[in-house]
Amino acid sequence: MPQLGCLARFFNRYKDEFKFAKKNNFDFMQLWYDNRGLCLHEDDKDFINTINKYNFPTIIHAVLNINEFEEHIPKLLDILNKLNHKELIIHPICENEDIDEETLNKLNLNIKYALNILKPHGINLFLENNSKLDPIFTTTDEIQKIFSQNADLEFLLDIAHIDNTNHLQELIDIKYPKILHIADRHFDVIHEHLPIGHGEIDFQYIFSKLLPKYNGKIILEIVNKDSDIINSKNLIENFLNTPNQ
C-alpha cells in the first residue's frame, strides 16, 4: 500500500497540522520551502526544533528559481541533515528570464550541482514536473532531456500539472514516478489544485490502467478545509483498492 501524505499548511500551527495528520492516518507531511527558507506558522520558530519535537515523518518540497540553486542547496542540505531526511523534492521555476533551450540547459547544470552535493549524503533528489503556468520541465521533450542526462535523478509526478491522459502516459514512460502529487483540476484552467472529485481527472483510470498497483508515496496537494482533504484521501484509497478492470 502506498504511503499517503498531506501538506503541513503554514497558516496553521504545526501542532494542529500534526494532530490532523495523525488523527486521519496520514503517513507523513510535506513541508514548504522557498527562498525565504522553511515556511511554517511564524509562532512555531525555531522551525527545526518544532518539527523534531513532534517526531512525525516529513518531506521538504523546495520551490527554487533556476538562479537560486547555488545559494539554497547548501542551506537545504543543512536542514535535511538536522531533520534526518533522505529525500528532497525540488519544484523548479523560472521567474527571471525567458524559458528556452538555454534555460533548460541551466536547469540541467543546476540539477547536476544539486546531485553532486546531495548524493554523498545519501539523499535522493526528486524533480517535479511543472504546469503551463510556469512552463519549465513541463513538456515530454524537456523531461526526457533532463532525465536522460541525470541517471540518479528521481521523478515526482504532479498529476494536476498534466495536459491530458496521453501526456501523463508519456511522462510515466520516461521515468516511473516514486512520488505523486495528487489534486484535481479542470483541463481548460491553466493551474488548479482542487479536492479529488471536483475536477476532470479520472483517478480511477489512472490507478487501474496507468499506475496499477502503485506502491510509492502519494502527497495530497490540497489546502482546502479539513473535510476536503479527508474526503480526497478516502477517494484515493478507494481507487487504489479497486481491482484492475
Where are these regions (language model features)?
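Hydrophobic "anchor" residues on beta-strands that sit immediately upstream
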Residues: F26, Q30, P57, N124, ...
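Well-ordered, non-membrane alpha-helical segments in soluble/globular domains
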Residues: D43-F47, H72-P74, L104-K112, G199, ...
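Active-site beta-loop-alpha junctions enriched in small/polar residues
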Residues: L7-F11, W32-R36, H61-N65, I93-E95, ...
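Active-site acidic/histidine proton-transfer and metal-coordination neighborhood
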Residues: K22, N67-L157, S232
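Alpha-helix N-cap/loop-to-helix initiation residues
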Residues: Y14, G37-L40, I66-F69, N96, ...
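Histidine-acidic metal/acid-base catalytic patches
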Residues: M1-Q3, Y14-K22, L77-K86, F137-T140, ...
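Alpha-helix-loop-beta-strand connector modules within alpha/beta enzyme cores
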Residues: F47-H61, N110-L118, I146-N150, F203-S208
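N-terminal pre-domain/capping segments
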Residues: M1-N81, Q245
